Amino acid sequence: MRAAGIVRRALRLGVVVSAGFAALAVVAVGYLRTEVTVRDPVPHAVAGLGAAPSSDAVLGRLHLAPGFRATVYAQRLGPARVLRFTAGGDLLVSITRQGRVLLLERDADGDGRADGVRTLLNGLDRPHGIDVAGGWLYVAETGAVRRVRFDAAARAVGGELHTVATLPAGGMHFTRTLRVGPDGALYVSVGSSCNVCVETDARAALLRVDPTSGEVRRYAEGLRNTVGFDWQPGTGDLYGVDNGRDLLGDDYPPDELNRLVEGGFYGWPFWHADNRPDPEYGDHPAAAGRRPRAPAYAFGAHVAALSINFFPPDRSPPGFENAALVGQHGSWNRSELAGYRVSSLHWAADGRITERDFMVGFATDGQVSGRPVDALPGPDGAVYVSDDYAGAVYRVTWDAREAAPGPVFEPPRPY
C-alpha cells in the first residue's frame, strides 16, 4: 500500500510520527512551532524506488545551464551514488544499498553511452566512497576502509579485499565517503549517528587514514554529515558540503560549504549557520570553550548537498574556470521540496562565492523523478551525474555555440 499523499508531523514533545517507513520516523521537540510536511513520493525517493528513465524522458524534464545538454550515459544500474574515473577513462560507480561497485566502460564507439557495465565487487557492506591510487581500488564501507588490487587496463580486480582501517559503523548517517588526498593519505567522512547529539566516538568528522599503516586520526570535526569534499585547484584548499540538522522548520539551519582545515571545528551539534546556538545543545557543557569556524557559504535548508567536485583548470568550460559542482539530493522534511538539482559554485577573485543553477528538473510540481548525488567532471570534458532514484548516470556536454552565463542563485536566508 502506498504511503499517504501528505504526512504532517505535529511538532510536540514526545510525539513520534511515522510515514510508514521506519527510517523516516522522528521524535519532535517541544519548542518548535513550525509544522514539517513530508510529501509522497519523497519517501519512495529516499528508498530509491524510481523507474529508469529514457533519454527522451531526461531531455524532456531536465533544464541545464546555457550551452549544456544531457543524455543518459547508463541506466538500470540500481541506486547509483559516488563516481570516480579510472586511468583508462572508465567510470566507477558505487551502488551502496545493493553492496556493489560497478565499472562503466568508456564510450569508445562515440554513441554517447557506456559501452558496457561490469560488476567489480559484490556483497559489500554498504560501499559508498571509492577511489583509485597506486594500483589499488579503495572502498569505504560503513564500518571499514578496504582495498583490492585493480588493473585499469584489464578492467578487473584481483586478489582479496584487505582491511586498511576500521570505522564507526552504522548510525543514522551510514555512508562513508573516501578520497585520496594530494598527500597520498585517505580522507574519509563519517557522518553523525543521530540528528543532534554529543558523539562519543569518531563520528561527525573527517578522518585522515594512512593507507600503509592504517592509522586513523581526526582531521576536522563538528561536521554533522559532510558527504562530499574536494580540493580546490590552485589554492589546494579543501572544501566540504555539510548537511544541517532536522526539525527546526522549513528554512533553518542551512546546509553549509565549509573550508576544512586540519584541527578545525565546525559547530555541530552546538552551533549552526553563522554560529547561532542550537536550541537543545547550545548551552551543553561539552560546548564550553569551543570556537566554531563559520561556513564559507550557506545553501538553502535541507537541500541535502551530497557532493562537491571542482572543474580541472584544463577542462573548464568558459565561465567555470574557478568553479565546482554540487549535487543536491533534495529534501524530505520541508513543506515545499528544496534541492533536487545540481548547482555550480563560482569563486571570485576577492573570495566571494556565488551559486548558479547547473542542472534542474529532478522535482517539479512536488513530484520527484530523480535525485542527483555526484556530479563529476570527466577526462573527456563532459560532466557525469549519478541519480540514485532513477538508477542512472547522465552525461552532460557543453556546446560553445550556445554558451552564456546562467543566472546567479541566491538561496533564502531567514537567519
Give residue spans per PLM region.
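A short loop-to-beta-strand structural motif that recurs across blades of beta-propeller domains
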Residues: 100-103, 136, 144-146, 205-207, ...
